[in-house]
UniProtKB/Swiss-Prot annotation:
Name of the protein: NADPH-dependent 7-cyano-7-deazaguanine reductase
Binding site for substrate: I87, E88, S89, H227, E228
GO MF: preQ1 synthase activity
Summary of the function given for this chain in its UniProt record: Catalyzes the NADPH-dependent reduction of 7-cyano-7-deazaguanine (preQ0) to 7-aminomethyl-7-deazaguanine (preQ1).
Family (UniProt): Belongs to the GTP cyclohydrolase I family. QueF type 2 subfamily.
Ranges of Basic and acidic residues composition bias in the record: 268-281
Active site: C188 (thioimide intermediate), D195 (proton donor)
Subcellular compartments: Cytoplasm
Enzyme Commission number: 1.7.1.13
The reaction(s) this protein catalyses: 7-aminomethyl-7-carbaguanine + 2 NADP(+) = 7-cyano-7-deazaguanine + 2 NADPH + 3 H(+)
GO biological process: queuosine biosynthetic process; tRNA modification
UniProt-annotated stretches for the region Disordered: 261-281
Length: 281
């Protein structure tokens, strides 16, 4: 259980509670979660050691045009890691559902409403794209870059989070490389539902021991935090124990409620080169 799972800032969330589904536009449904909750635990100050965004894909975005004809789209939202808040996912889903029976004059009006409401909730300007299904169908399904570390023949008996599994993980050899794993699994901070993801780690520094890294990632299996918080924890732990010169951590989680979340944290750039989905998304 997270150290801050009982924080008062989480008490009013709709997550884990029975809720009604509104079908008329209602921006008040959005609920923020202060990023400071886990960043205080990670001892992160105002000067963050990373750049980045939380990239959301909205697969269930629909509204009515001015004549009442339903429209469907796939949305992409980029929320800066520097924003005061992350957006709680169930509230995001409920908010998007509120578009379903609401008439809008144009796709651009929908995009601008999303920008305004999500920026207000996050506490900083967000970027939004609203794409046609035809456009999205033309996008590729990709895999992560670099070496997959999942096929190691090792025994694991503990699934409790332990950052000390990274102790001594940095070797002597200096490398520039990319590693990835599809075995990332954590649990929702509130509901304990499983969150399934893949994570890509790109770095320049002393070569990271594959076994230690895999054991560390598997230790998230019974850990309770939101997606964004897990990625920041991975980033800060790798910086603490391995001290790379440069580091990028990019996780892509499977969708729930028509949404997937893809947190990106990097010393090098604020956004990934692309937002193509993976096979499990």
């Amino acid at each position: 259980m997270s150290k801050y799972s009982d924080a008062k800032e989480l008490a009013g969330l709709t997550l884990g509670k029975k809720t009604d589904y509104a079908n008329q536009y209602d921006p008040s449904l959005l609920q923020p979660v202060p990023r400071s909750l886990n960043r205080d635990d990670l001892q992160l100050g105002d000067e963050l050691p990373f750049m980045g965004h939380d990239i959301w894909t909205l697969y269930e975005l629909s509204w009515l045009n001015s004549k009442g004809l339903p429209q469907v789209a796939v949305g992409e939202v980029y929320i800066p890691a520097t924003s005061a808040n992350l957006i709680e996912s169930k509230s995001f889903k409920l908010y998007l559902n509120s578009y379903n029976q609401t008439r809008f004059d144009s796709w651009e009006e929908v995009r601008q409403r999303l920008i305004t409401d999500l920026s207000h909730c996050a506490g900083e300007a967000v970027e939004v794209a609203v794409n046609s299904v035809t456009h999205y169908t033309q996008q590729p399904i990709v895999t992560m870059e670099g070496e997959c570390i999942d096929e190691q023949d090792i025994d694991i008996s503990s699934y409790d989070f332990d950052d000390r599994l990274l102790e001594g993980a940095a070797g002597e050899e200096w490398v520039t490389e990319t590693l990835h794993s599809h075995l990332l699994k954590s649990n929702c901070l509130i509901t304990n539902q499983p969150d399934w993801g893949s994570v890509e780690i790109r770095y320049q520094g002393h070569k990271i021991d594959r076994e230690k890294l895999l054991r560390y990632l598997v230790s998230f299996r019974e850990h309770n935090e939101f997606h964004e918080q897990c990625v920041e924890r991975i980033f800060t732990d790798l910086m603490k124990y391995c001290q790379p010169e440069s580091l990028t951590v990019f996780a892509r989680y499977t969708r729930r409620g028509g949404l997937d979340i893809n947190p990106y944290r990097s010393t090098e750039q604020a956004k990934p080169d692309h937002n193509h989905r993976m096979a499990r998304q």
